[in-house]
Amino acid sequence: MSWKYVPLLILILTAFAGAAGCLSTTFQEVTYGDDGLEISVENSGKPVEKAVLQVTIMKVEGFKQSEVYRKAQYVDLDSGRNAYTIPVDLEPGSYKLFLIVLVGDERKASVIRDLEVAP
């Protein structure tokens, strides 16, 4: 291997090492039931007090989306799996869920999920 590629290799390895810490919080299973929306969040990092969980629900009808719910609330993220219940009543139909976890000014996790509510 030529020595001229060593700095590039070091830069790439440094980028991967830095990005590894960004995946400490992830969304897991999201379901809808009688109690509302059940959201599971996995935190593989240290516990965090007063993280913000933001939930936006859009009803999808054809090519049109309309917002039916939006709320941000403070949550405590313990290490491991965390479960949160969002009390919301949804009519049967198709929805898109936009879920975000913020710690301070930093977005720790975000995901868009499809949800079908049966009649």
What spans do the regions from the language model cover?
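Secretory targeting signatures
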Residues: 1-26, 39
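Primarily secretory-pathway and cell-envelope proteins
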Residues: 21-74, 98-102, 106-119
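Amphipathic, non-transmembrane alpha-helical stretches in extra-cytosolic proteins
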Residues: 61-65, 79, 93
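Aromatic sugar-binding surface patches on proteins
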Residues: 77-85
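A short tyrosine-centered beta-strand micro-motif
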Residues: 82, 93-99
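Short, flexible loop/turn segments at beta-strand junctions in immunoglobulin-like
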Residues: 87-90
